[in-house]
Design a protein with these regions (language model features):
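A substrate-engagement module of RecA-like helicase motors
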Residues: 1-111, 183-191, 321-322
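Short glycine-/polar-rich loops that comprise or flank the Walker A/P-loop
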Residues: 2, 133-136, 344-346
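Residues that form generic nucleotide/phosphate-binding pockets
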Residues: 20, 33-37, 52-55, 79, ...
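Generic amphipathic alpha-helical segments used as scaffolds and interaction surfaces in large
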Residues: 36-46, 55-71, 90, 94, ...
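A contiguous, basic/glycine-rich beta-loop/short-helix subdomain that forms a polymer-engagement track
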Residues: 77-111, 121-130, 255-362
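Signature of the SF2 helicase/ATPase Hel1-core->accessory helical subdomain module
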Residues: 84-112, 116-253, 353-362
């Protein structure tokens, strides 16, 4: 038995599809939506979604974007699909028939799973999707692409625009306060105490604001720009900020994860609508702090796999506003491949018509 594995973004989200296929105004309290754009733009779009829902409900369609003849433009698909941060997972009403999770269950029963390199790397990083690595025979075709795929998968980027960052921190402190008020955990994390959390977030914001000021000095004012640090070497002041940010964001990641786990255990005994809304919001916060923590840890490294870590800042214009981003990626990824693949999976075959070892095809 064999099956193909695809990323979450290739599958329709039945919760989103139900909302977009409905002829009634979205019942926010019933479906526990956040600020998602889950209303059809016009009647034609609603009818298209209703047809998709009919096909899904009658098993004529498996929910995979590539497996329907109905034209779905990118904007509509963005609203029909979901990502990890916006998924309720086992807490969702549609979990049992969700195309993504149905496919995941099929993977566990399959003898052969076909997936692209990027999905394999992501699966090994998160220890999800694919069967237990110890039970795998992994065949990597077109193996000469593996370093590039690994490099892309391990690149970390995050927005660090000071006002935007302030908003995210304010939203998180309010979210924690709501959890403490409505779904108080049995054991209160020390960082969840308002005074301590506010001081923590204030220090984090001040570091981000300082980093904004320093990075903007390297780029022409008031326009899109980019600055790359030669050989990945950061000025001492910037390096110290990155090291402190790595610690502070990791602590917030841990706090978000703790609350998310606690909320997920309460689903059988509390107001399910309010609880699901908080789970979604906390899941998104966790995703943000997870990415930030990885970014600043990588930025704090002088080298990875014995080679410099590329570090650069960009300023981009979006909807008339300038946004500042910071990026990191290792030039060489041998250590990461060692950790994710070579040490984890006992049997690996790499095939390629152009693969060389020590510059030789033999």
């Amino acid at each position: 038995k064999f099956t193909a594995a695809f990323g979450r973004g290739r599958y329709v989200c039945p919760r989103n599809l139900t909302a977009l296929a409905s002829t009634e105004p979205t019942q926010q309290d019933l479906l526990a939506f956040l600020d998602d754009e889950l209303t059809p733009n016009n009647q034609e779009e609603q009818k298209r979604c209703a047809k998709l829902k009919g096909d899904l409900d009658t098993y004529k369609w498996d929910g995979l974007r590539d497996h329907t003849d109905i034209a779905i433009d990118d904007d509509l698909w963005r609203r029909l699909s979901t990502d990890k941060a916006s998924c309720l997972n086992r807490n969702c009403y549609y979990y049992r028939e969700c195309p993504f999770f149905v496919a995941r269950r099929e993977i566990q029963e399959a003898e052969v799973v076909v997936a692209n390199h990027a999905l394999v790397m992501a699966a090994m990083e998160s220890e999800a999707v694919l069967p237990d690595p110890k039970n795998l025979l992994l065949v990597l075709d077109e193996g000469h692409h593996l370093p590039d795929v690994a490099r892309d998968a391990l690149e970390m980027s995050a927005e660090i625009t000071a006002p935007w960052y302030r908003l995210q921190l304010d939203l998180f402190t309010k979210l924690v306060a709501t959890c403490m008020e409505q779904f108080r955990p049995k054991t209160i994390p020390p960082l969840a105490i308002p005074e301590r959390l506010n001081a923590h977030c204030e220090e984090l914001y001040e570091l981000i604001a300082s980093l904004n000021n320093i990075l903007n000095l390297y780029m022409p004012a008031g326009q899109e720009a980019e600055h790359r640090f030669a050989m990945g070497e950061l000025p001492d002041e910037v390096l110290e900020i990155c090291q402190r940010l790595a610690k502070l964001t990791e602590m917030l990641r841990g706090l978000a994860e703790l609350f998310l786990n606690d909320l997920s255990e309460k689903t059988g005994s509390h107001d399910i609508v309010r609880l699901h809304r908080l789970i979604l919001q906390m899941n998104r916060a966790l995703g943000m702090f997870e990415a930030q923590s990885k970014l600043w840890r990588l930025a704090s490294l002088a080298q990875s796999s014995g080679a410099p870590v590329t570090k650069w800042a960009t300023r981009e214009e979006r909807e008339g506003q300038l946004h500042l981003w910071f990026h990191c990626v290792g030039i060489r990824v041998s250590d990461q491949l060692e950790r994710l693949l070579w040490r984890s999976i006992p049997h690996i075959i790499v095939t390629s018509a152009t693969l060389r070892s020590l510059n030789s095809f033999s």
